[in-house]
Amino acid sequence: MAPEMDQFYRSTMAIYKSILEQFNPALENLVYLGNNYLRAFHALSEAAEVYFNAIQKIGEQALQSSTSQILGEILVQMSDTQRHLNSDLEVVVQTFHGDLLQHMEKNTKLDMQFIKDSRQHYEMEYRHRAANLEKSMSQLWRMERKRDKNAREMKESVNRLHAQMQAFVSESQRAAELEEKRRYRFLAEKHLLLSNTFLQFFGRARGMLQNRVLLWKEQSEASRSPSRAHSPGLLGPVLGPPYPSGRLTPTRLDMPQRALGEFGSPRSRHGSGSYGPEPAEARSASQLEPDHRRSLPRTPSASSLYSSSTQRSRSNSFGERPGGGGGGGGARRVRALVSHSEGANHTLLRFSAGDVVEVLVPEAQNGWLYGKLEGSSSSGWFPEAYVKPLDELPVNPMNPLNPVTSMNPRSPVNELPSRLRSYPLRGSHSLDDLLDRPGNSTASSDYWDGQSRSRTPSHIPSRTPSPAPTPLPSSRRSSMGSMGVASDVKKLASWEQQPPELFPRGTNPFATVKLRPTVTNDRSAPLIR
């Protein structure tokens, strides 16, 4: 046998062996995996159906509410759309099962028998032809050896058998290669059909979702507007945390009205006896004071301002933006340093330099405040750096440099020096000139010792209240109350008409000057490496 024919034979047998031992087992495994994929998809489809039915029920509940009807409609539409897409996907899976898996499973069983028969037939035919050719060649060799006259005809017959054998092995190899290619083409064409079905499904899904998703997004963003929120919930931001018991934080209007003396400094409140019963001397002294002292304007205490300014809004657990909403007692006023325009954003607040804005949020959100322009109904966001806090303390018309603090008209007269502590004077003898009382030297010395140590104005609220002063004996209080009531009232009235001078003689006018830190930028500094 010629070596080339033997090579064709081995190549053809390798193709049949590859189809039987590699391709068909791989196709059987692919059918098994495809069936697992179908079972997983059916389980996924059932779970998706249950999930989107639950979403639809929640949307129907939102439709019955008074605040979330738009959101409920969005949820119902989303559920219907997803279930419709799920049904379309089931069509794709049916195509995958009917046009791919079933054909592969059926063709695999038939193909295994067909390839076995083809290989057996080729092997038998090849052996038969090879045997005939071998027999003819042996006869030709004997006839040539005997010099037979029929040797010429036998040689032609051997050449013909050899050509037929060569054509047979070539045709058999091409047939085997074609069968191998046909099987790979079958697998590729079936999955191409599946890919085309997926492409059609995703095209329909894109056309269905593209416009609806944009509409749902616009409606969802529109529901974030504070004007649409009828009650504090998911869409309405709440300013200030609730109390641990669940009730809302009371505002300044809901708080009980306090006495006028409670708006003074902590030291003056201790001295005026705000933690105990009011002595009879204090009541008599308050009756002797003029009417304009009783009708002093009531200013909010620094402690209430501090507590209201330290409120916190609730956490953004649902991605809510901080909205505007005026709290009862947490609003503060600021003055604009520069002008601010809203531009194309209608949520910003427009104001000019010098305008007063009422801040409606307890603290800045990323450097932005939300407030309302005083004297108008416009409100919006504005940068925190554009404004500065507005001093709400009243100014003494006789001396604009010294603010007037609230005084309790019902406080004892023997504690008059404590009322005057809101005036940050530079020396102690100026106050002694105003109220030179022989019986109150201890209180005044204690006060000026504390003033020299603190060097801070008394109208600034203190975090920790100072300890109460040691009460005077009852006999001393009664004597002081009976002897010095009228004189103290006269001195206080004359002091209000003619306030003390800003820098009395003998004091240091630069004692409270604070120097601003400077930076040395000269080149004489050493170069450190």
UniProtKB/Swiss-Prot annotation:
Keyword annotations of the record: Cell junction, Cell membrane, Cytoplasmic vesicle, Lipid-binding, Membrane, Phosphoprotein, SH3 domain
Residue ranges constituting the SH3 domain according to the UniProt record: 329-392
Domain IMD: residue ranges: 1-239
Gene Ontology cellular-component annotations: anchoring junction; cytoplasmic vesicle membrane; cytosol; nucleoplasm; plasma membrane
Main location: membrane
Biased composition (Low complexity): 301-317, 473-484
Example of a GO MF term: lipid binding
Function (record text): Phosphoinositides-binding protein that induces the formation of planar or gently curved membrane structures. Binds to phosphoinositides, including to phosphatidylinositol 4,5-bisphosphate (PtdIns(4,5)P2) headgroups. There seems to be no clear preference for a specific phosphoinositide.
Protein name in UniProt: BAR/IMD domain-containing adapter protein 2-like 2
Gene source species: Bos taurus (Bovine)
